[in-house]
Amino acid sequence: MAIWTPGEAVLATDSKVTLSGGGAVLPAEQSCKIRTSGRFFYAIAGLYNHAPTGFDAWRLAEGAIAGATSVNEAASRAERRIQPALEMALADIRRRDPQDYARRYAEVWLAIWIAGTERGDPVMAGREFLPGRTVAREFPGASGAGAKGEIGIAIFGERQAIDSAYGDVQAIGRLVEAKGPAAAARALVELEIAGEPEKAGGPISMARIRTVRTTTGGAEWIERGLCAGPR
C-alpha cells in the first residue's frame, strides 16, 4: 500500500509470502517487504525471486536505487534493471508450470514503489510490471491523483478484500482524509490480512516520509515488523 499526501508519504505492507513449486503450493514464509537504500524507502510485491533463472527482485532493485539522485530516477533505473530479468523468469515459470503462472501471474507480475524527498517534500514513484506492458506512476503527478492538494493511492499486492470493502479509490481517499495516511494505510493492510488470511498475514511494516526541512527529510519507520536494520 502506497499513500501520498502533500505532507506525508506512507508505505505499508504485510509480511506473508506465498510460494509454489512443481505445481504444489508450499508453506508460506514471512519476510520484510520494505527496504531502504540510501535516502529511499522501497517496497516490492509479486515475484521476488526465481532460482532457475537467478532472478532476485530485491538485489536488482537495491543495485538500481543505490545510485539514484531522485525518486523518479530510482524508479526508472529499477525498471531498466528488473524488467528483462523478470520477463525471463516469468517465461520460464510459464513454460515449467502454466497452471501456476495462470493462477499467480496472469494479471500482475511485480510492483515496486519508492518513497523519498525532493526539495524537502515527500515524493513517490512506482512501476507495475504487467504482462506485455509496464505502468509508470508518480505522486505528485502533473495532474489527476497526486496533484497538489490531492491524495495519491496505490494498492499493490493482494487487494481483493480492500476492493470488496471500498470499491474504488475515491472511497479510500475519503478514508485517508478521515484517518490520515498512516492510520488509513494500517487499516487497509489489516483489512486485507483479515479478509484473505491464506494470502496475507502479519506482522505489518510501515515507513513514512514527511515534509521536514532537514537532511533526513522526515524519513522514519512507523513500525518495522520483520524489517530489521538501521534507520
Regions found by a protein language model. Name each.
Residues 1-231:
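N-terminal nucleophile
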